């Protein structure tokens, strides 16, 4: 593979995470405007975003098989057509049913693209490079989470319709579409060469279950928290711009945290530092919820930084539970995390309708506490120390 081809594929991976990050994170910023557009209460409107998350979950789950049947380049190009149709549906329809369908299609497209992006990084890089590249790729999710809430706040403050936010997100997929030209993708399934000997199967162990629960609770807690921060902040009397700044601050420090921890983690036992980070994140989230308005930006900045390495560390630890890294095992943990994404508004919507946004934030805080317990329990059963003695974390 040529170096320019590798660079193009790596950028497709980076942008695939940015696309999903933008779609998922911008929800909290535009939800109130979309609710007004359809004349619905915010808590009812949040349920329709479950279609976005369901699309992401279904596509990540199915793409484990789809990647072996349909070439990756074909999937990405067809995804661009679907993206254009979905954004057009949002712009030109006033039907809630069509809005839900468009959200589902956006979820399908971003889920397929993200699973292809993850696969490309694991194929292109090995050993130490794979871990650091995966963490750097994941930082594009956060980068989009920092940029697009600011874009949304800029557009909404100027009374520009909410659907233009999704048109801006579509530009990320346009970049992916352009990169597919003159680019060779790894072949899979019937398109691949079958020269390698089969790898012996290994039992996963109970540690994988702890990590799967941690992944689900972490993503559900994180998105449940960040999706309702704008409504919570507005309820405290903050402006839309200030509420958006809190979300952007979180993802900005999350992004810097990922870059910092891609260097820091190699000096520590991964399970131990993961337990410490999960505990700190739970405490910092509690301080944000119960603290004064003046201290909220500082708490959300430190929360973003210290929670940034948790999800990628969970996935890395999962891959180290077997002697040979299992794509199915990693996909299982990713799927559990995506289930957390799908459940975000299923769980928090009724809580907000009944008890308000603060109750949703406290629920998210409880889920972070569960992540801490799972990471602590993992210390007694994890196999990563025996499997990664010569390798890096």
UniProtKB/Swiss-Prot annotation:
It holds the Pfam family MFS_1. It is found in: Cell inner membrane. GO terms for molecular function: transmembrane transporter activity. It comes from the Bacteria. Signal peptide: none annotated. The keyword Transmembrane helix applies. Its main location: membrane. The chain crosses the membrane at residues 11-31, 51-71, 78-98, 101-121, 134-154, 162-182, 206-226, 245-265, 273-293, 298-318, 332-352, 361-381. It is a multi-pass membrane protein. Keywords: Cell inner membrane, Cell membrane, Membrane, Transmembrane, Transmembrane helix. InterPro entries: MFS, MFS_dom, MFS_trans_sf, MFS_TsgA, MFS_TsgA-like. GO terms for cellular component: plasma membrane. Belongs to the major facilitator superfamily. TsgA family. This is Protein TsgA. It comes from Salmonella dublin (strain CT_02021853). The lineage of its organism: Bacteria, Pseudomonadati, Pseudomonadota, Gammaproteobacteria, Enterobacterales. The gene is tsgA.
